[in-house]
Amino acid sequence: MRHRKSGRQLGRNSAHRKAMYRNMAASLFKHEAIKTTLPKAKELRRVAEPLITMAKSDSVASRRKAFDRLRDKEVVGKLFEELGPRYQERPGGYLRILKCGFRPGDNAPMAFVELVDRPLPVEEVEDEDEEEAAETN
């Protein structure tokens, strides 16, 4: 019986699952938004949110524990130097999962996973007046 067994198997053995979660969490922290299937996104939340909570208290022990989970020095550095301080006042709920349709090949439900307070890229909008002024000169 499967009673009280939490987590999805996702058609993978335990080592493959662990490596997939590690890679997805590292990509999420590196890029601050990723696109994946909906079940993977929901499971990623169980892996990534405790790491951000751990990063809120910067210590050597917590950095080592995070490195043990992620195995990427660059990502661990960003986690503790940028993301931990950013979410210092937030008591949880660091990720947002947005459904984004279905994958064309197999119709799997897809989702965007993003960090809640991530800075959005600034798009430079040029005014038409500035362009006209530049053309007349």
Curated annotation (Swiss-Prot):
PANTHER family associated with the record: LARGE RIBOSOMAL SUBUNIT PROTEIN BL17M, RIBOSOMAL PROTEIN L17
UniProt key word Ribosomal protein: yes
GO cellular component: cytosolic large ribosomal subunit
Protein family per UniProt: Belongs to the bacterial ribosomal protein bL17 family.
InterPro entries, A to Z: Ribosomal_bL17, Ribosomal_bL17_CS, Ribosomal_bL17_sf
GO molecular function per UniProt: structural constituent of ribosome
The organism's place on the tree of life at top rank: Bacteria
HAMAP family: Ribosomal_bL17
Protein species of origin: Alkalilimnicola ehrlichii (strain ATCC BAA-1101 / DSM 17681 / MLHE-1)
Subunit note: Part of the 50S ribosomal subunit. Contacts protein L32.
NCBIfam families: L17
Protein's UniProt name: Large ribosomal subunit protein bL17
Keywords associated with the record: Ribonucleoprotein, Ribosomal protein
GO biological process: translation
UniProt lineage: Bacteria, Pseudomonadati, Pseudomonadota, Gammaproteobacteria, Chromatiales
